[in-house]
Amino acid sequence: MPGRGPEEMRLMSIVIYTRNSCPYCAMAKQLLHSKGVDWTEINIETQAGRRDEMVERSGQLTVPQIFIGETHVGGFDDLSAMESAGELDPLLGRASGPVEKAGEAAEHHRVIIVGSGPAGYTAAIYAARAELEPLVIAGLQFGGQLMLTTDVENYPGFPEGVTGPEMMELFQKQAERFGTKIIREDATAVDCSARPFGVKIADRSFTADALILATGASAKWLGIESEQRLMNKGVSACATCDGALFRGKSMAVVGGGDTALEEALFLARFATKVFVIHRRDSLRGSKIMQERALDHEKIEFVWDSVVDEVVGEEFVTGVRTRNVKTDQTQELAVEAVFIAIGHEPNTKLIRDQIDLNSAGYITVVPGRSQTNIEGVFACGDAMDPVYRQAVTAAGTGCMAAIDAERWLAEQGVE
């Protein structure tokens, strides 16, 4: 397809359905903005009748929903998958970004940080202040898990609390202030076999004297057929994105930790009833979150239970649970199911190169960030199976940058 000129691209019909406080909507718009295209934004929360219009056009009950011309792209994950596969630019009718030519030398940096979030951005701040001129491969889903967090109340320095996206924007600006270069693309390959270490994105290669892995973690799913079949049709892992779509309805949250309780409390703003389904008879979340949820009149707990099936044909109409002690089953009438059963580390890229523990977390020298490979450091949720907090992630990001700086000095790298 020949590339369109700027005016043709500007006039191309791109529609994105969004709502307020939707992190994936913000990420989708940022990706489209990076392509130099304009779009029409339809806020289904503030514009009457637009929710039903979106559902009719897309068959989905999640935001964002993106249409490019006559093509229904889907949500942010679909948009970013097209970008990673090199399919987005042709659909937009624009020339692709710079493509590495055969034999062309990779771009070299003293420090490359793979991943963003509080760990990656903190590592970048410290590395940049040490004049190491770091490159951050932030990923298309930049900012880590905090981008999906409504309120952060336990990070020092924010007495009134702060939203996750707001906090990550501040981290990013601080990193850039000191000279960090940020690329919002996914790393497709990492080579730790020899120095300089290699990192690839879709169409470019980079090398680094020191590598910091801050790849974070991703939400776990139940792994049942009905969950996958009804994904984005009432099944979600992002209450801030999709909760308001089910205003006045009953909903369910699966899980018993802080994330599940936070989701339940947020959903209670919109729902008539929120069922929290937990496989144990006690919660794992912090005391203050437990108290808030247990005392909330709209939240009902379904103890000692697991989800056997998400019920529904076209959209979610219920959830079938089973008590793990009595084997008794019941069906709860809900129109949305939010999964909050924990996370797993994003370590697939380096699985056969770096030592991992049995759960897939990167192992490091005790008290440090050094992996089993000299010059490769790890921080954040990718190496922390215990705490998994924003403040501890930031702390390990600091450690990784300092460890990398000292190691480079020992190697005589300038």
Predicted features and spans:
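Glycine-rich dinucleotide-binding loop and its adjacent helix/turn
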Residues: E100-H108, A217-F270, V364-P366
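FAD-site-proximal beta/loop scaffold in flavoenzymes
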Residues: G223, Q228-L245, I341-T392, T396-M399, ...
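A Rossmann-like FAD-binding core segment of flavoenzymes
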Residues: Q172-I201, S205-A208, A268-P366, R406-E414
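Thioredoxin-like thiol-disulfide oxidoreductase module
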Residues: N43-L61, E87-A95
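Structural micro-motif
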Residues: S58-I68, F76-D77
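Local sequence-structure signature of Cys/Sec-based thiol-disulfide redox active-site neighborhoods
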Residues: R10-I42
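Beta1-alpha1 glycine-rich phosphate/pyrophosphate-binding loop at the start
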Residues: R19-N20, H33, H109-F178, K249, ...
